[in-house]
Amino acid sequence: MRPIQSPPGVSVPVKSRPRRRPDLTLPLPQRDVSLAVPLPLPPTSGGSGGSSGSAPSSGGSASSTNTNSSIEAKNYSDLVRGNRIGSGAGGTVYKVIHRPSSRLYALKVIYGNHEETVRRQICREIEILRDVNHPNVVKCHEMFDQNGEIQVLLEFMDKGSLEGAHVWKEQQLADLSRQILSGLAYLHSRHIVHRDIKPSNLLINSAKNVKIADFGVSRILAQTMDPCNSSVGTIAYMSPERINTDLNQGKYDGYAGDIWSLGVSILEFYLGRFPFPVSRQGDWASLMCAICMSQPPEAPATASPEFRHFISCCLQREPGKRRSAMQLLQHPFILRASPSQNRSPQNLHQLLPPPRPLSSSSSPTT
């Protein structure tokens, strides 16, 4: 059967999808030069309106991390795969050794035989994340394509995740929160929304440096600020407007969504349990009702006014009322975490209890 053709000289209008909606344009977090932690501006290649200079490099452990990033894709054979240290919906993570340098890394093997368009998007996001360089963000060193399987070489965090950690001392919790906020503010300044902030995606090493990890569901935002409406991430830590799209007129601010997830995680550290009146492993209906219908959880009355206010700034039902990561870095609760006090060896040893390992599996693989 031949397709129906329009008569000569008659043009048929073709409907085109609108490229952007002005009402969905969201403000970017503004750079605050008074921050104790310098945050580089978004790269100029992302569009107009950025700084003409290049982003300043971060100091501290980030500079030392750069010395490990000289592994080329052609040297994949130099990696010796060891134990599996974690697994999730996006893939499996293995501990590997780079034989020429004897350095340890984490190798994430991404699941699935993806279509070409999906593979290009994954590779594009990984390439952008390779340029991320901050002391509180897990470094992405290299990407490999092995027989159609995408594998990502990451910084190795030897103490695992903070899932199950109970940090009831506010001074220590303030230092923990400051590190996470520092990394989150840096990511947001580069138009990167994580979308899955939770304790199991916050890693710690033997130096007690806390870093944000697992960008398997992160999204790079263009200058047009396309809305992030896809349901990725862990529902227990999702913001109300992300679960129920009828809230907030259907608009989703990815930055504010990360702040909600951060607030739930920090309150969970303080309480030693999931802060909502349901189990985070419960059924979806119970979780959604608790998050969308009930009042946001609060810090207990026994906590300090500063901490109670900090949690309130994160867990506002209306996204526009939540503070940005850069604003929260100036909150009185965070400012009490003086690096000169919290970075002494004695306090570092007591900062957190030994976290649970990423995985109970210890069988070596090849």
Curated annotation (Swiss-Prot):
Known EC number: 2.7.12.2
Effect noted on mutating T234A: Abolishes phosphorylation by ASK7/BIN2
Residue ranges of every copy of the Protein kinase domain listed in the record: 79-334
Coiled coil: none
Keyword tags: ATP-binding, Chloroplast, Cytoplasm, Hypersensitive response, Kinase, Nucleotide-binding, Nucleus, Phosphoprotein, Plant defense, Plastid, Serine/threonine-protein kinase, Transferase
Tissue and organ expression note: Expressed higher in stems and leaves than in flowers and roots.
PROSITE patterns: PROTEIN_KINASE_ATP (PS00107), PROTEIN_KINASE_DOM (PS50011), PROTEIN_KINASE_ST (PS00108)
Primary location: cytoplasm
GO biological process, one term: plant-type hypersensitive response
Identification of the protein by name: Mitogen-activated protein kinase kinase 4
Summary of the function given for this chain in its UniProt record: Involved in the second phase of hydrogen peroxide generation during hypersensitive response-like cell death. Involved in the innate immune MAP kinase signaling cascade (MEKK1, MKK4/MKK5 and MPK3/MPK6) downstream of bacterial flagellin receptor FLS2. Activates by phosphorylation the downstream MPK3 and MPK6. YDA-MKK4/MKK5-MPK3/MPK6 module regulates stomatal cell fate before the guard mother cell (GMC) is specified. This MAPK cascade also functions downstream of the ER receptor in regulating coordinated local cell proliferation, which shapes the morphology of plant organs.
CDD domains referenced in this protein's UniProt entry, alphabetically: PKc_MAPKK_plant_like
Membership in a protein family: Belongs to the protein kinase superfamily. STE Ser/Thr protein kinase family. MAP kinase kinase subfamily.
Organism listed in the record: Arabidopsis thaliana
